[in-house]
Amino acid sequence: MPSFDTVSEANMVEVKNAVDQAGKEITTRFDFKGSDARVEQKERDLTVYADSEFQLNQVLDVLTNKLVKRNVDVRFLDRGKIEKIGGDKVKQVVKIKNGIETEAAKKIVRILKDSKMKVQASIQGDAVRVTGAKRDDLQDAMALLRKEVADLPLEFNNFRD
């Protein structure tokens, strides 16, 4: 019976490359000269430092542009609140989401069940496995999920025949 897994994972190598590129651009840009603006990465957390809230937004804009150019979906980013760290300096922690949360997984299963397609969906940890009798049914299910689930960057992998 053919099946595939629906997952939501960011390519961490591309994220690291985008952070490095953003850091290089920030150090060479004229409007950041003499400022403490930078982006640091620790595993799945990006910490953005800047001298003011306006500058923080500019650094985040540079970072998101680099992520988009490296084909990393910006819907993976979960921005925290802006914290003051002394004087006018501010920082913001941006978490990179990994996996499909339980609520979103239940929503995906519900969408597939409500569509009356001949597929079964089951939650497997942070992924959703979709199984069907025919490969065509699975392709229709993938098209439906791409159309219906707009708030999550979905990927399909682990195809079995």
From Swiss-Prot:
- A single GO CC term, please? cytosol
Q: Which UniProt keywords apply?
A: Nucleotide-binding
Gene Ontology MF term list? nucleotide binding
Reply yes or no: does the keyword Nucleotide-binding apply: yes
Superkingdom of the organism of origin: Bacteria
User: What is one Pfam family matched by this protein?
Assistant: DUF520
Instruction: Please state which protein family the record places this protein in.
Output: Belongs to the YajQ family.
- PANTHER family in the cross-refs: UPF0234 PROTEIN YAJQ (PTHR30476:SF0)
Function, in words: Nucleotide-binding protein.
Protein known as: Nucleotide-binding protein HEAR0865
Organism, as annotated? Herminiimonas arsenicoxydans
